[in-house]
Amino acid sequence: MAPLLGRKPFPLVKPLPGEEPLFTIPHTQEAFRTREEYEARLERYSERIWTCKSTGSSQLTHKEAWEEEQEVAELLKEEFPNWYEKLVLEMVHHNTASLEKLVDSAWLEIMTKYAVGEECDFEVGKEKMLKVKIVKIHPLEKVDEEAVEKKSDGACDSPSSDKENSSQMAQDLQKKETVVKEDEGRRESINDRARRSPRKLPTSLKKGERKWAPPKFLPHKYDVKLQNEDKIISNVPADSLIRTERPPNKEILRYFIRHNALRAGTGENAPWVVEDELVKKYSLPSKFSDFLLDPYKYMTLNPSTKRRNTGSPDRKPSKKPKRDSSSLSSPLNPKLWCHVHLEKSLNGPPLKVKNSKNSKSPEEHLEGVMKIMSPNNNKLHSFHIPKKGPAAKKPGKHSDKPLKAKGRGKGILNGQKSTGNSKSPSKCVKTPKTKMKQMTLLDMAKGTQKMTRTPRSSGGVPRSSGKPHKHLPPAALHLIAYYKENKDKEDKKSALSCVISKTARLLSNEDRARLPEELRALVQKRYELLEHKKRWASMSEEQRKEYLKKKRQELKERLREKAKERREREMLERLEKQKRFEDQELGGRNLPAFRLVDTPEGLPNTLFGDVALVVEFLSCYSGLLLPDAQYPITAVSLMEALSADKGGFLYLNRVLVILLQTLLQDEIAEDYGELGMKLSEIPLTLHSVSELVRLCLRRCDVQEDSEGSETDDNKDSTPFEDNEVQDEFLEKLETSEFFELTSEEKLRILTALCHRILMTYSVQDHMETRQQVSAELWKERLAVLKEENDKKRAEKQKRKEMEARNKENGKEENVLGKVDRKKEIVKIEQQVEVEADDMISAVKSRRLLSMQAKRKREIQERETKVRLEREAEEERMRKHKAAAEKAFQEGIAKAKLVLRRTPIGTDRNHNRYWLFSNEVPGLFIEKGWVHNSIDYRFKHHRKDHSNLPDDDYCPRSKKANLGKNASVNAHHGPALEAVETTVPKQGQNLWFLCDSQKELDELLSCLHPQGIRESQLKERLEKRYQEITHSIYLARKPNLGLKSCDGNQELLNFLRSDLIEVATRLQKGGLGYMEGTSEFEARVISLEKLKDFGECVIALQASVIKKFLQGFMAPKQKKRKLQSEDSTKSEEVDEEKKMVEEAKVASALEKWKTAIREAQTFSRMHVLLGMLDACIKWDMSAENARCKVCRKKGEDDKLILCDECNKAFHLFCLRPALYEVPDGEWQCPACQPPTARRNSRGRNYTEESTSEGSEGDESGEEEEEEEEEEEEEEDYEVAGLRLRPRKTIRGKQSVIPAARPGRPPGKKSHPARRSRPKDDPEVDDLVLQTKRISRRQSLELQKCEDILHKLVKYRFSWPFREPVTRDEAEDYYDVIEHPMDFQTIQNKCSCGNYRSVQEFLTDMKQVFANAELYNCRGSHVLSCMEKTEQCLLALLQKHLPGHPYVRRKRRKFPDRLADDEGDSDSESVGQSRGRRQKK
């Protein structure tokens, strides 16, 4: 569809094949290669010479006409129902009437008839309507036609009088009025239901001056089909049908005709021609030949050829050259030759045809007659047998056929040249005229038997002895020309096939042999097929069976041979493709040149590999390093931070914090320390991380002076590894911050940290967990697949059984069912006949129908409910499967992430290709990756050759992996002997980037498919094509940039704020005495130099109260013990130990102070301040304490904390109340011994404390117990837990009574060896004290029993509820020395074996320690143990908050015990893993 140029169609430019158009016209999308053509076409389109085909509007531009046609097309889609299209197009096609007449006749046809396919309503009753569709229209009967004619005449044929006529007229008028009212009501309902046009109606319809009545429907009868059911109702009268869709008006019809048809000519009688697509779609009958009807269309598609001279010299020129030219210059068409369909009616009466003995077809008869009629045999080939159209089949038109045949044959005879050498040209022209005028087809059919044989026999002699230059028959020439024109056209395939069949029938063997090669095979094949059909028709049934059997065997043999040849050919091709050669020896296209990776100024391209290492490590292990899903570290940002002078402080230190958080919490870093304190206990912040990195990466810790020289001697002899850094880098870190180093030094430190973390147990556990999760996911997947297969197998088996059962019972059920159905039908018919008589039966039937409807509705509701439930279940299963599939894919991807990253492959030049994660987007090419530490070689084998890296190869980084060369073609067998003959050359390590999909496609096209390296690279690149293109797309996203920050100023500000914060907390918590806090803050804010800050830190440490210090800053304070008179020697030893410990503490403190004074960096000062922070007992602070009596905060100056239980009391809340804070240690009333409480009323606390310190002595047994307590405290400190087991100490101290002055105290000893007391009052005191303690302990033990009862009910505690038997684990008692379980603990609780909460907790720890010792890592018992222990901790915190639960976990030693029982040497642990203490 396109606008007309004037009144002629103007074809659009065809699209360019396979090339991108350079110049395109917007509204038609026509493409041009050159600007000249494009501008010329635009200039022509802008002229006002175009006509809209649909509306007829002229003097428009091409775009205006185009848009008007589009608008008309949209209007027709809305306003013209599709069931009228065929009806109107059949009337229009090849019609010579004017447009207005066509519109009127089409409108009248639509208004008086329903169209086939039209959807309307079928009126069954007064209120019931059924949706139906017209299937068939019955023609009008004769009676109806006469009635219609009579109504149209309007005359009265009745012979009655005027009076009768007037009465009859009155009746007729009344009937007409009622009919008109019904029609109006029906029209109104139709108009209500009909679609309203969005366009404006014509003005004629808007005028309300005169009521217009539409024409009535003709009394046709229709077959209709119900839309809801597959039923057809026949012979429905037109009155029972109601049209629901409004028919189109005349304006819409006019648009439709113009839009889809074009008038072929400018005359009044020029026929209308419908578009070819619609003709094919609706199979519209053609009334004329195509080339006569569509000259414009023909001239646009076929350029005009040179016109032949059609007349003889004697004839006059034609008066109508246009028509002659159009008829003579017709295209090659199957209608011209051999594509003839003659009817038997042409050859005369059917009896004569049947009686003729010749069995030849009518076409052959006619050709034989024409041979006789033509004076020269060569004239036969110019005879044309026309194809009769559909109009020829109509009755009453047989008289025109001979004339048409003669006329067409005559025109074609005149239009063709003679192919033979005629001796008299005058005869050639005159004889066909006279004979064609005298003969008729009837005469030709009568004389075919006598006349057809002579020319063939006579014509055969000159054919065999003809001249060497023999011409092909016209049928062959026509086939050649028709094949050349239409061989590639899809719509001409059937016509071309018919032409080939007819030519194969007519041509002889010699003529077929003289055809061109391409056509010769087609015609010969068609000839053999036709011959085969003839032979098949003449065969008997047995011969056919035998022939088919033989054919099948031959076909099988042929297919078998072809399949064998194809397999051999494919195998040879596969083997040829599988051969591999050295890439550099093969020819081919050069690889594309990629650009270098963009790096910031100051960061060389050679360091990009290390940047990718760090970022890829952080990305792959993000589940371990970044569990809180922080924003990721990207390569672009990291490079900017490395190259920035001051702006990279925050970004780089964040990376260091992420790495050190994992390293310092691992067992490998247990022995990392500084000044006697573990690095894991020092606060890790952005400001201390630089110094902590230096301390972690030292090759050895600072030892004592005696060990220092030995360490220095061994330092140089040890080999340098990837997880270590050169000493000169670390020495720079002593005097400068991390962000102040060069880019290369920063990267070396980051890579060393990554390698160090790869050696930790945390990484190993993370990898094992990921692999275990992946294995479990695979198990679940296989189990699900197995279950589905079992279900399918069971369903299939069940279906087979049901089918077998149905086959057995099917026949009997069918017979019984038919009989029952017949009986039911008979009964129903009888019931209907009987019950239709009276009113009662009508009521019954109505009730029965309502019951049936109700039952049917219930059944439908039940089915709907079942269907909805089934759909909901299917949706739930679908979501579950989708979630399981997502979890499976994520688990597999995470398991792959933690494995070693290898390159995709290498190219001919040994360059490696890398694809990293989304944080390092793009496809990277690494050149010059080989260095001196790589021994690149491969081994020769007898069967196959594989290149293996050296076993001693130690990777420089994650880049150095030679997996691409290992056993490249081992699976291809011994036939493929490919050996690499080149090795990668050493050179500068450079990184290139493929950053566009075009470059990737070019790379894939340049890689050789048979190169030993490039074939594998190409295969992997194609496999991961989508992933690579996504990564390339991510590489184009812009970087957000870094937050600018001055690192030195940041460190200075935070050091000031940290100092002020520690001082404030000390004062508020009552942990230190600092005079002039405001002055101290002002002084700190004004400081700039490190030395001044150091003095402030030392002053801060001095202000802390000694008893609130711990770690290396607090002396080992032994409580003064009651001794007997004969224990002076042990007291001297004790004093010596105390002096040694105090000396050690003093020396450690002095070292710390010296380190502060010598600190050269702010991060070092932050670390030393963090040590002070870690040595302060912040849990003893009164800042957040509440009074135990009134539960209120505030009034810190009147709040006192118990040194035993650490609970707070207001001075005035105590009874008796205190009026000032006592000096020294103070115990609350609950922690004081009862005798001391009773005897201390009215006594000063200071005197009592001094008297307690000066009186009494203690036996050696008590001293051993105290030493055990101290060792236990040391164990807590070694484990890095700054908690005191104060409940245990309190329980043991509270047994010791505070004796009165001048009286020897009682001795605390083992219960079995307890000596009898001397004085009765003392015995009474002890009894009272014991009762008091026993009541409190019994309450606590009752709570312990309740906790145990809840633990037994906990669902994850099932492995620990009962003792382990030897049936469950044979070697359990060989590994576990002290078995323990919840049942045993429960029995001990019921028997009263526990004397304190600590004994109960000791057994609980033993249960968990045994589980941890016996079970392997990753087992379900260990996971249950962790959850049960967490539950125990929560219960203890809720019910027994004063009893801390701490269990030390040691993974390496199988013979470990609980923390409070065994004394393990932490130094041996430190020497067995991680850094070497001594080299």
Curated annotation (Swiss-Prot):
Modified residues (Phosphoserine): 152, 158, 161, 325, 330, 345, 361, 374, 706, 709, 717, 1315, 1338, 1464, 1466, 1468
Reaction(s) catalysed by this chain's protein: L-tyrosyl-[protein] + ATP = O-phospho-L-tyrosyl-[protein] + ADP + H(+)
Domain WAC as annotated: residue spans: 20-126
Extent of Polar residues compositional bias: 415-425
Positions with biased composition (Acidic residues): 1254-1277
Domain named DDT: residues: 605-669
UniProt motif C motif: location: 207-213
Any single GO CC term annotated in Swiss-Prot or TrEMBL for this entry: B-WICH complex
Subcellular location: Nucleus
Positions of modified residues (N6-acetyllysine): 1331
Assigned EC number: 2.7.10.2
Signal peptide: none
Cofactor section: Mn(2+)
Cross-link Glycyl lysine isopeptide (Lys-Gly) (interchain with G-Cter in SUMO1), sequence positions: 827
The keyword Protein biosynthesis is annotated on this UniProt entry: no
KW Zinc-finger (keyword) present: yes
Example GO molecular function: histone binding
One GO BP: positive regulation of transcription by RNA polymerase I
ZnF (PHD-type) residues: 1184-1234
All copies of domain Bromo, residue ranges: 1335-1439
Family from the record: Belongs to the WAL family. BAZ1B subfamily.
Function text: Atypical tyrosine-protein kinase that plays a central role in chromatin remodeling and acts as a transcription regulator. Involved in DNA damage response by phosphorylating 'Tyr-142' of histone H2AX (H2AXY142ph). H2AXY142ph plays a central role in DNA repair and acts as a mark that distinguishes between apoptotic and repair responses to genotoxic stress.
Protein name per Swiss-Prot or TrEMBL: Tyrosine-protein kinase BAZ1B
UniProt source species: Mus musculus (Mouse)
